[in-house]
Amino acid sequence: MEKEEKDVKRKEIRQRIGKRVAVLRKFAGLSQEQLSETAGLQRTHVSRIEKGRYSLNIETLQAIAEALGMTVDIIDPGLQDLAPLKRLTP
């Protein structure tokens, strides 16, 4: 796969996850500010994630899932293999 194709695929993944985070956050009745506080993130990060402009690492994804009261596979079923993982610590 060429670099351009990989970049497009990554962008699509970021956008898909971002849209899902936004839908689930709203369904939970949370503002971006509330989600960011609960997940330990800056509100601007939550905004960028929801717009598909921020690449998530597993720790951030796990923090968002926990703040929403769910597992990462609910955010994106393609991530089901990550669902059993707990937040990673160095």
Each language-model region and where it sits:
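Conserved hydrophobic/aromatic packing and binding residues within compact polymer-binding modules
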Residues: 21, 35-36, 46-49, 75
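A short, Lys/Arg-rich alpha-helix, primarily the initiator
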Residues: 2-27
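DNA major-groove recognition helix of helix-turn-helix/homeodomain DNA-binding modules
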Residues: 59-74
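Recognition helix of helix-turn-helix/homeodomain-like DNA-binding domains
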Residues: 40-55
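Short basic helix-loop element that most often maps to the first helix and adjoining turn
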Residues: 19-38, 63, 89-90
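Short, charged recognition helix plus adjacent turn
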Residues: 2-6, 76-90
